[in-house]
Amino acid sequence: MKKSTRTTPLVSKGISKTEPIPKHLEQINQWAAGIDIGATSHFVAVPEGCTTTAVREFKSFTPDLYSLAEWLKECGIQTIAMESTGVYWIPVYELLEEKGFEVKLVDARRVKNVSGRKTDVLDCQWIQQLHTYGLLNGAFRPDNEICALRSY
């Protein structure tokens, strides 16, 4: 029986943080951010060099989300990848989209480290790195009218 020669994108296999991203990959999204969504706070990673602090924590209250969006604008971020964790991603997603960012919602199972220690800082940096190299696929997000109907 002949083996298949078809290659599968790394992200569909669920990339492990222990596997380094090959150096020969081209940076697709140079001004990309990664957000690790949590119930009480969100950790945000931006590329090294665009600010003094590459990772910041923002609480999940509305004023903090506006501060998050403002900080991303100051850093020159154009596109953002975030996990679809529970319902906590919804306010962040909607606010960032409203502010003009290209936002990708990604399945947390595709970007999580399967084994080993996990920290929110490492997670947001990993999401940012994968998004920089174009290795993340965004989840389907229906039109605003459908989202409004689903909220009832």
Report the location of each language-model feature.
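Phosphate- and other anionic-substrate recognition elements at nucleic-acid/protein interfaces
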Residues: 1-152
